[in-house]
Amino acid sequence: MTKITYSQAINKALTEEMNRNKKLVCFGLGVNDSLNFFGTTKGLEKKFGSERVFETPTSENAMTGIGVGMSLSNNPCVMMHQRLDFFLLAMDQLVNSAAKWHYMFGGKKSVPITIRLVVGKGWGQGPTHSQSLQSWFAHIPGLKVVMPTFPSDAYNLLKKSIRDPNPVIFIEHRWLHNIEQEIKKIKYTNKKNSTELISKGKDFTAVSYSLSTIEMLSIKNVLQQNKISFDLIDLKSIKPLNISVIKNSLKKTKKLLVLDSISHPFCSVGSEVLSQLYREKNIKLIKPPILKTLPDVPTPTSTFYTKDFYIKKNDILNDISKLVGKKIKFKYSDTLLHDVPDSNFKGPF
């Protein structure tokens, strides 16, 4: 069976949407360099020309202003940043213009811009090159925030984002760009609720998104060997956030683990999930829920500190053991460098 990577799925979605809408423009730093923005923009300039697919100067605020202006002029845009951190220079354009335009003009004007931001960890990039601020963007009225996990999600959510009349923050964890999926699963669906139950079990409910979902799947075999099964729910959309699938699962398991391994604890996506569930009347847990996040400190650079900063499989399994009240037998080495991806990763950094 032919497979497609996450990067290829994004490329496929961009190609199809640029064919569908002749006004759609893609631009950003690295769009036309030899690495083609992690392979996601490969061949686009050749197909659609340099007026629709182009590099920009290193001026994030100017890039965003141009994108907002073009979008207001009925030219939808996909703007790309190889680091979320760099986009912080453009917050005024995003928060005070793009996010508010539809509201301020009574729904008569919109800003159809999709902003692709890459997050992740790796190779000691430290405090200013590895931030994941999805909760920050989700706090802003007028913005949607999505974080797809699998190629089919990236394909679907990017197409939906591009077709949305208002701004969408599309966040990709770069460790996901080489994940593969059967190409037959790459189909466009217009479902409103992106939250999905991707694995079924009975002992507890796990909620995750983006790389956190892959981390939960990586310990599934160990749990099965210990006769523990779980419902795994992948959020995909951070805002809007739909908790109906989680509620249905908790009626069965009554135990909850929220793995938010790319957020800090305060006002995290995980804490928002718990907050919304707490306000529901009919949810009764038999044990306090567990929320796993990064510590409330900036990302360290030294591997001496990263080994205690990033969440490890052992950490997750120990918490699951407490949650289900059962000792779990497992063997994972903690001697690896915790901010270096495995051999499947093929990205530039």
Model-derived segments and their meaning:
Residues 1-167, 171, 334-349, ...:
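Thiamine diphosphate
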